[in-house]
A protein has these predicted regions:
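N-terminal Sec signal peptide and the immediately downstream disordered periplasmic leader
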Residues: 1-88, 94-102, 667
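Short acidic/polar hinge/loop motifs at secondary-structure boundaries
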Residues: 105, 130-157, 176-177
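Outer-membrane beta-barrel translocator/receptor signature
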Residues: 133-134, 149-151, 162-240, 248-252, ...
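Acidic/polar loop-and-plug regions of large Gram-negative outer-membrane beta-barrel proteins
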Residues: 224-228, 241-312, 327-360, 403-426, ...
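Structural signature of Gram-negative outer-membrane beta-barrels, strongest in the C-terminal barrel
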Residues: 247, 360, 379-391, 428-546, ...
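Membrane-embedded beta-barrel scaffold of Gram-negative outer-membrane proteins
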Residues: 308-324, 328-334, 518-584, 591, ...
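Gram-negative outer-membrane beta-barrel transporters
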Residues: 447-448, 543, 567-649, 688, ...
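C-terminal beta-signal and adjacent terminal beta-strands/loops
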Residues: 640-649, 671-718
Length: 718
């Protein structure tokens, strides 16, 4: 793993040159534009970016694009601020999700997993309000992407079909990029070293690019590499951001940039570890056990070009034109192992190798008009919008005729020769085109009462190559309705309703795509804002009903390649509640704490998605010590989840439960502010070294979770 590829070196050099260009203006550019100067660490500005040094949420556009506060949105909203990302050292999206109220993660492989909320999978991943190229059946570790390029993360639980088309009732995750807002030279440099020889370095530089401060730039680069508690597994990651903003006039802002992310794991597991020995007794593997080989890899590259033009007509009306182009390439060579191990000889496992080349390109364009007007003596708000997206998806697979053997698995070290690969064959190719019109209004007829009414008309067409077939849905309407009532300055009650319509990428046993998920979602709740809005609380109760919900049903081989197939669950329902408190109790005390609980069943009253915990607690808090110890901040948290299970056939062909008991992970941190600009921070995760695992329902296999680990981070801001 002690390697740095030439490709990584070239990209890092290019970004270093760009960052040097920005910092070269530091001696002269001290002006401030009308869009504001960033605070002390110079990484935040504008209503969308989060307050420094706190867990206080700002305004959000993720649920309803009206620039509302969290309290004004009639849905459950969690915001992971930049300060919380730093306090917990949440470096990937999956780590963020594991620490969000009502959200769970099932890491079913070392480099893949699923994020879930309210009993259903989350597949609505958004960057700055624009959907990404994510495809669940062909996921390549996207949820393990770096958070270095993002200022904060918005998570809206429940359906967001009004703004993003996909009416998935689980959640939407919106990653908000760092912006080029600073008119003064600012920088943030971090160096981190952790368990299993993990090392990371990050640089974040921003400055004005002209004397007047009307043109600003920002560059972020992060490189990391390291090994793992899992044998053979190593990683190498590169994340880059170049962005700029220009004030074309007092009322017109042009912004744009490019991001590049590359993840290059070696030795990833494909599938998990067998649960049973061949005699039917349970296995108990050590935490470093792997089924991978030393030639396996899973390289993923994602490039995103983006541009926004915002014009403010007056104090009440504005328009925004946005465009983005995303391209994801994934190239893998993988080894899957099936069967069960003989307890005495170690024999019994069968290897299966396959390689994949995946390319996804997506263009998105949108036009949005926001306005406000006076009616009944109070301010009302309205938004009108059009969205267009076009995605091309191509996947090639390579099989092998090379004979392979695992031998005695107790002696397995991954030193199997790489097989000879056959020529690539087209596995799947399609194009998805969508366009939609949406509108919503925020009506305030009397002071304490507000209504949000809106809807979205969507056209969807998927053309599948090789089958000469297409799937088309025209003028599908998704309504949205919400009501908010302010009892006083502290407490607000709300209710919301939306329908669900979501085409699927999942296939049945015969290779046919499942029909769209359809249904509705209802939510009621109470929100509060204590300490002048510094501490926010939410109590939410919800009921969801869906038809055609995809459930993993088993494995099937198509064109020599193994795939998971799904069945559609009719009449699936989920109902539950969530409680969350997040923000600042005092300027020195940040806290987030949440409890969630749900029940999900199909029409036959059978539990669905049983691999998900029905009850969860997620907490974390930090406190800056007083007096002579004021340079020290300490913190910690607990993530607890109830037991989970899946039913699978054991070696005797009898259905048996694979059960994970309830468990809690304790995480601690401490930071010492050495000088005003220089700090050292220690994070320890899974303090009590709890053993736990994720499960792959279709395969009946498990992947062990991370044991106790630690990281030391040095940060210098100037």
């Amino acid at each position: 793993m002690q390697r740095t590829t030439k490709h990584f070196q070239i990209n890092a050099l290019a970004l270093a040159i760009a960052m040097s260009t920005i910092s070269a203006h530091a001696e002269t550019d001290q002006q401030t534009s009308e869009y504001g100067t960033l605070p002390t660490i110079k990484v935040k500005a504008g209503s969308g970016e989060e307050n420094e040094k706190s867990y206080i949420a700002g305004k959000t556009e993720t649920a309803v694009p009206l620039g509302l506060s969290v309290r004004e949105v009639p849905q459950s909203v969690s915001v992971i601020t930049q300060q919380r990302l730093q306090d917990q050292q949440l470096s990937t999206l999956v780590e963020v999700a594991e620490n969000v109220t009502g959200v769970s993660v099932n890491r079913y492989e070392t480099n893949r997993g699923g994020i879930y909320s309210r009993g259903f999978v989350v597949d609505n991943y958004i960057i700055d309000g624009i959907p990404t190229t994510y495809s669940l059946p062909w996921s390549s570790g996207e949820i393990f992407s770096s958070m270095a390029l993002y200022d904060h993360i918005d998570i809206v639980r429940g359906a967001t079909g009004l703004t993003f088309g996909a009416g998935n009732p689980s959640a939407a995750i919106n990653m908000v990029r760092k912006r080029a807002t600073s008119t003064e030279p600012t920088a943030n440099v971090e160096v981190s070293a952790g368990s299993w020889d993990n090392y990371r370095v990050m640089g974040d530089i921003a400055n004005s690019l002209n004397q007047s401060g009307t043109v600003r730039g920002r560059a972020v680069a992060q490189y990391e590499q390291g090994d793992s508690y899992t044998n053979l597994l190593s990683k190498e990651k590169l994340s880059l951001l170049l962005s700029a903003e220009a004030d074309l006039s007092e009322n017109t802002l042009l912004s744009g940039g490019v991001t590049y992310q590359e993840d290059d794991p070696r030795g990833p597991m494909w599938g998990g570890l067998p649960v049973w020995f061949s005699d039917g007794t349970k296995t108990n593997w050590s935490k470093n056990t792997t089924t991978s080989a030393d030639w396996t890899r899973w390289n993923v590259k994602y490039t995103n070009l983006f541009a926004d033009l915002t014009h403010k007509f007056n104090d009440s009306w504005s328009a925004k034109l946005s465009y983005s182009h995303g391209k994801r390439d994934a190239n893998s060579k993988l080894l899957y192992v099936s069967g069960s191990v003989d307890k005495n000889t170690g024999l019994g496992l069968s290897p299966y190798a396959s390689a994949y080349d995946l390319e996804v390109e997506q263009d998105n364009a949108s036009l949005q008009l926001n306005g406000s007007f006076d009616l009944w003596g109070l301010e009302q708000k309205v938004v009108l919008g059009y969205q267009y997206s076009n995605q091309d998806f191509t996947a090639y697979a390579r099989s092998t005729d090379t004979k392979m053997e695992i031998g005695n698995f107790f002696e397995w070290n991954g030193s199997m020769p790489e097989p000879v690969w056959n020529a690539p064959t087209l596995n799947e190719k399609y194009n998805i085109e969508q366009n939609a019109l949406f509108a919503a209004t925020y009506l305030n007829p009397i002071e304490p009462l507000k209504f949000i009414l809106g809807g979205r008309f969507t056209n969807y067409e998927k053309n599948i190559y090789g089958r000469n077939s297409s799937i088309k849905y025209d003028h599908e309407f998704v309504p949205y309705a919400g009501v908010i009532y302010d009892f006083n300055d502290v407490y607000t009650a709300y209710a919301s309703y939306t329908s669900i319509f979501q085409p699927q990428d999942n296939k049945d046993f015969d290779g046919n795509y499942l029909d769209p998920v359809e249904g509705n979602s209802t939510e009621v709740g109470l929100k509060s804002a204590w300490f002048d809005g510094r501490l926010n609380g939410t109590l939410a109760l919800y009921h969801i009903k869906q038809d055609n919900l995809a459930q993993e049903a088993g494995q099937v081989t198509r064109n020599g390649v193994k795939e998971i197939y799904y069945r559609a669950a009719k009449g699936a329902t989920s109902e539950g509640f969530e409680v969350e408190v997040s923000g600042q109790i005092t300027p020195d005390w940040n806290i987030t704490a949440g409890y969630s609980q749900f029940s999900a069943k199909d029409a036959n009253d059978a539990d669905v998605n049983t691999q998900l915990p029905r009850k969860m607690i997620q907490t974390f808090t930090t406190y800056k010590l007083p007096g002579k110890l004021e340079n020290i901040t300490v913190g910690g948290g607990v993530n607890w989840q109830s037991s989970t299970y899946v039913n699978a056939k054991n070696p005797k062909k009898v259905i048996e439960k694979i059960e994970q008991g309830d468990y809690a992970l304790v995480n601690l941190m401490a930071r010492y502010q050495i000088t005003k600009d220089f700090s050292a921070q220690l994070n320890i995760n899974n303090v009590f070294n709890k053993k736990y695992y994720g499960v792959f329902p279709a395969y009946g296999q498990i992947t062990l979770g991370a044991p106790r680990n630690a990281a030391l981070t040095l940060q210098y801001k100037f």
